[in-house]
């Protein structure tokens, strides 16, 4: 059978695949030795693409291998992280240092929580002053692009119609600690230090108060809607995780007490298909749960070397969990094996963080973002290789307590103890 000549570039690609496979399998020192020997031109990410190609080669002829290498759905930049295949993906999305502040909104107290709607059109912010604001992202972008002379000549009616803050909600009596948009309805859920979970119908411009609420026994710390919108997970200061039916407010908990955390729950999140959810706790553990039975599937003990787990979220394909802890490290976990595949280090070099904040993906999952508490800057890493990118100074006058990135476009919101929330966006050259 005729075979094409193997050139230098082919061998370089082979060596990169070998390094990626060694990193994926946990042979870090061997991989580093090979890296030092062959000096690849770009950073290698953990991946088992080589194993898949070998399996194809053993099962089929070499044309199948060539087909696998060239398939558009094997390596698809911008669709999310998948280390089984995308060891050599070229990053297409902008890194954090290219974003700029487009709008700033102020509360009357520290702003410590924010959330995006599923379509990326709305952002809600919550404050220690017990208020909630809902902002329209298109209006924020339009406002930032508006010439100052046009802005100064706006009538009161025009200003109201174009104002980015479309709702301000007041019904809590203490700090708002968590927020979540309903996946299909114009409903916003909020949790507070006042021990209540409240539901707001923001489709009505005059609505300032919640139309439903749940009285909890402890301060709420994190909430997450089931993708159907029929249920909501609630993590509180108490270690027992709750699941509520939002129509009847019936509460469900795991039938096995051993499933539960041993300290306050800091983070709860469903995956996109609702067959799993993940929790992180002050006890230092990450727990993965079955979305149907509400039973704990597995526990990652001392996920951040015993430090408090601040956040835990799923990748788009639900193969990975991105977590952060008070050790100022972000980690990418492979769910099928429970292993840490990638560590994102370098934040907190000037001192270990004191307050909770989150690690997040950008909208394409090409980057991982994590605020640095001491420098008030945003650390950015290549999600596949953990290569550090340029820092972004966040412009706040106090520590950043929350970051949320848009699920659909290059925008994110930062919330700070300086009472402000900043909306950041990376405009394209055609904007």
UniProtKB/Swiss-Prot annotation:
Q: Name one Pfam family in it.
A: CSTF1_dimer
> Which keywords fit this entry according to its UniProt record?
mRNA processing, Nucleus, Repeat, WD repeat
One GO MF term: RNA binding
What's a GO cellular component annotated to this UniProt protein? mRNA cleavage stimulating factor complex
Question: Where does the source fall among the domains of life?
Answer: Eukaryota
**First and last residues of every WD repeat:** 106-145, 171-210, 215-254, 260-301, 303-343, 395-430
Q: What does this protein do?
A: One of the multiple factors required for polyadenylation and 3'-end cleavage of mammalian pre-mRNAs. May be responsible for the interaction of CSTF with other factors to form a stable complex on the pre-mRNA.
Know the name of this protein? Cleavage stimulation factor subunit 1
**Species, as recorded:** Homo sapiens (Human)
Name of the gene encoding the protein in the UniProt record? CSTF1
